[in-house]
Amino acid sequence: MGTCVVRGRWRAVGGAVFRVLAVWAVSTLTMLILAGLLPDFRIQSPSGDSPTTIARTAAIGAGAFGLLSALVWPLLVRALLLVPAFFLGVLVFFLNGSMLLLALRLVPDGGSEAGPETAVAVAAIMSAVASATSTALAVRDDGAYRRRLRRLAHRHRPGPRRTGEDGLPARPGILFLQLDGVGFDVLSEAVSPRTLPGTGRVLPPVMETVASWIESGGHRLSMWRTDWSSQTGASQLGILHGTNHDVPAFRWYEKETGRVLVCSSPSSVAELQRRAVERTGDRGLLAEDGASRGNLFSGGAQQLALVLSVAARRGRGIRSRAGYFAYFSDPANATRTALSFTAEVFREIVQAVRARMRGDEPRVKRGGLYPFIRAFATVVSRDVVVAAVIGDLFAGRTVVYADLVAYDEVAHHSGPHSRDAQQVLARLDRSVRLIAKAAAHAPRAYRIVLLSDHGQSPGRTFAEAYGITLEELVRIGCRGGRSGSRPLAGRRADREVTGAEARAVARAALHRVDEEEKETRRGRGAGPVVLGSGNLGLISFPELPGRVSREEIERRHPALLGTLAEHPGIGFVLVRSEEYGPVVLGPHGGEHRLDQRVVIGPDPLAPFGPEAEDAVRRTAAFPHAADIMVNSAYDPTTGRVHAFEAQIGSHGGLGGSQGHAFLLRPAELSPPVPEGEILTGAEAVHRVFRRWLAETEAPGAPLSPPAGGPGERVG
């Protein structure tokens, strides 16, 4: 047996040496070809050299570049943790080119030279070729492939291991992978075969890997219903920390402090997490050997990467950005992501121009910084989170929760069912496949749970559909009142042009952690504060303490509530009555008294389904519910709503697919709810996940799901 072990080690060493030599040879050949093609790149003296000398120079230069990439690059990236990560993609090219120039100076002949711009291009090409060669060689060897994935993730020190009699972990781990904003309807379409219009040709599903899991019976798909505030802040806080009490919207005004809390501000989400932990007395879902990757909240995990709630604290903020180092310390990864980032920027510009030329409707502006925000969400954030998750799998962590925000960002501006969004889903499917392959090589079995935090509902913006913003509508309603005050903040909400989750990650990467909160901070006595959270609007009167009653609003602004409730773009209005408690007002004099369960006239909540009553009643009891809460109109036949932000795919309120998230669980886990029932509320999802974690205590759990689609060989 000892002889077999020795032979195996020598075989591994021999294979590693062969791969190093092969990559070196390919890099040398690449340098020779580029020297022949690029006029500003020379690896011979001006007087000319023999072919042997040129080849030797190329080999030395390629070898020096490879050594510098392996030894110096990780140190540079660690230093760059002090630099805003958003600029890392630009610095990648400059630093890579600088290392190539240094490598050429190390060549003894001294005849090699390259212009700065040429050095950047040559370094990028050589890094990409070396990475592709190394990957191609490693794919043929399971051991090498496993080591390749480990290097991809640059895993940290492994967490605690629990071993059984056979030396393997006695309990499987669980990976919760959140596909941000992918509604139940969107996922159902993405895992179904498609028919090419006009030809009848059947195409494979957009998400082939996920479809294969369902088709094989290894996973079961179900829907879960969100709270009224159908957005990541409320959903993820409830899922990770067990409560989303007093989170009425994506952004809301708190009178006692004069602040607007926003679920994309690090200081705001840190405060929400503190309140949740204080309320539950529990650190969170991930407290036991867990990892939180790309999320708004930590979930109590000690292993963090791109977690917004710790970004406001500089000391831990640097630590939370260690995920950047874990990925970008490989120069090939850095180059590939930087190139993909650039390509994604141009892809968005081209897609936006095409949409305008086709006259697509509805449509929102997609200029300014948006192409860069989209590229950050669909490339940088995705790559870093996926690498961190793979590192967690190889570290054998007990539970991992990660969020991929790419789809949500694109769907906001291109539409939930657009071709642009489908392309993002296909790329997310490839990320899921890569993670599943890594799980197959991990030191413990893993159960992979896919879920979303909400869906998205399509529709023209409120401003586009009716030629007026919510802020302007409130102003009209206030004109007949005694105060004659003018709202402050509604225009800002209507001008919002970027997806909240992606913008939050990008802001943290730029170290602009509190800019949005500073912009939305308002003093007392300045008139109503009007905010938009998707198709949910909030109106607060800062000069009046506590929750202002319906009767007081009607005394001060007699026309306001009627103006809002009777507008065709408004579905219903929630206020608090001194006599009846929470009351929902709607068109044609409709009124729904929630505490008494009494409806007068047409029920304003009827178009939103039977579950709307409980959802609105729960939010009405929140201490920081706005004085007036407004939900846009909803068309049940088309599923369309009207966002109070510049988004044609929106979420945050009631109406349509935005409130229908999905849950895809391994068949071995117990059903989330009894058959015929629908899981409702993020807090209920937390309880289900707790139960599933308890179920994994039993030994002998099945292995992770297969990584590929039908017919794909795994392992």
Predicted regions and their residues:
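Juxtamembrane/disordered regions of integral membrane proteins
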Residues: 1-121, 132-137, 141
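Short, highly charged, low-complexity non-transmembrane loops/tails of multi-pass membrane proteins
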Residues: 141-160
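Acidic, His- and aromatic-enriched active-site or binding-groove loops in soluble protein domains
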Residues: 241-254, 318-321, 422-430, 467-486, ...
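A long, amphipathic alpha-helix that forms part
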Residues: 379-380, 384, 392, 400, ...
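Active-site neighborhoods of enzymes that stabilize oxyanions during catalysis
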Residues: 264-271, 275-282, 286-289, 293-300, ...
